[in-house]
C-alpha cells in the first residue's frame, strides 16, 4: 500500500483553506445583501398597500461602475411622498446592534445628497435603519440628526445623549432617542411596515423642526 504524502496534503489544504474562507465570507455577504433587499421590498410593498407614492431607484450595476462606463451612483434608494411632503430615503439593514459609519455601509455621496435635500421646504430626507436582531426594529433618522450624532461621535464631543455613543457607528439606543420608530406586523414570512403612521408622526410633529430647513 502506498504511503500518504502529508506534505502534499498540507500544501493542498494551505491553498484550499483561504479559498474556502473567501467563499464563506462571500456567502455571508450575499445573505446579508439578500436580507437587505427583502427589507427594501417589504417597505415598498407596505407603502403600495397603504396607498402611498413610492419610487424605488434602480440600482446601478457594480460592474458598470467598476469598468468606468460613465454611469453615476444613486443619490439614495427611494422617494416616498405623503400628505404633501417628500421623503428621500436611504435604507440600511443589519443583524448587528449598530449601523457602521464605514463607506461599505453608508456611502459619502448618500450622506451628501440627503443633506442637500434637507435644504428644501417640504422635504424630509433621512435613513430607514433596520435592526434585524435580537428583534426586528426599524427607525427613521432625519439626516440632520444623523449628522449631528456622527459629528459628536467621531470627534468625541460633549453631548446630552443618554445611550452610549459609539465613535464609528450609530447604535439602537441612539436611534431610540433621535429617531421615529416604524411599527410593523409580521405575516407568515414578510413584514408589513406602517409607513403611513410614520409619515403622519413626522409631518405632524416629530420632525416639524426640520421642515423649516
Language model: regions and residue ranges:
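Nucleic-acid nuclease catalytic cores
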Residues: 115-149
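Short, solvent-exposed loop/turn segments at secondary-structure junctions
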Residues: 62-64, 96-99, 135
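Mg2+/Mn2+-dependent nuclease catalytic core
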Residues: 94-120
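Acidic-basic catalytic patches of nuclease active cores, encompassing PD-(D/E)XK
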Residues: 1-69, 205-208, 212
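Intrinsically disordered, low-complexity terminal regions enriched in charged/polar residues
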Residues: 139-213
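Basic/aromatic recognition patch in beta-strand/loop cores that engages polyanionic ligands
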Residues: 71-75, 115
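Conserved catalytic cores of phosphodiester-cleaving nucleases, focusing on short active-site segments
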Residues: 78-80, 84-96
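A structural signal for short, well-ordered beta-strand segments and their strand-loop junctions
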Residues: 56, 88, 126-129
Amino acid at each position: 500500500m502506498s504511503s500518504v504524502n502529508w506534505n502534499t496534503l498540507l500544501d493542498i489544504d494551505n491553498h484550499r483553506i483561504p479559498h474556502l474562507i473567501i467563499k464563506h465570507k462571500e456567502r455571508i455577504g450575499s445573505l446579508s445583501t439578500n436580507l437587505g433587499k427583502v427589507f427594501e421590498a417589504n417597505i415598498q410593498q407596505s407603502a403600495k398597500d397603504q396607498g402611498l407614492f413610492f419610487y424605488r431607484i434602480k440600482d446601478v450595476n457594480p460592474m458598470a461602475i467598476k469598468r468606468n462606463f460613465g454611469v453615476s451612483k444613486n443619490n439614495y434608494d427611494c422617494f416616498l411622498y405623503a400628505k404633501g411632503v417628500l421623503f428621500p430615503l436611504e435604507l440600511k439593514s443589519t443583524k448587528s446592534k449598530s449601523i457602521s459609519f464605514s463607506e461599505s455601509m453608508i456611502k459619502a455621496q448618500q450622506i451628501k445628497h440627503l443633506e442637500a435635500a434637507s435644504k428644501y421646504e417640504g422635504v424630509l430626507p433621512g435613513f430607514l435603519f433596520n435592526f434585524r436582531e435580537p428583534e426586528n426594529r426599524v427607525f427613521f433618522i432625519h439626516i440632520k440628526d444623523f449628522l449631528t450624532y456622527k459629528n459628536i461621535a467621531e470627534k468625541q464631543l460633549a453631548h446630552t445623549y443618554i445611550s452610549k455613543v459609539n465613535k464609528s457607528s450609530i447604535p439602537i439606543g441612539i436611534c431610540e432617542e433621535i429617531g421615529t420608530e416604524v411599527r410593523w406586523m409580521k405575516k407568515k414570512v414578510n413584514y408589513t411596515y406602517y409607513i403611513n403612521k410614520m409619515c403622519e408622526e413626522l409631518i405632524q410633529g416629530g420632525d416639524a423642526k426640520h421642515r423649516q430647513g
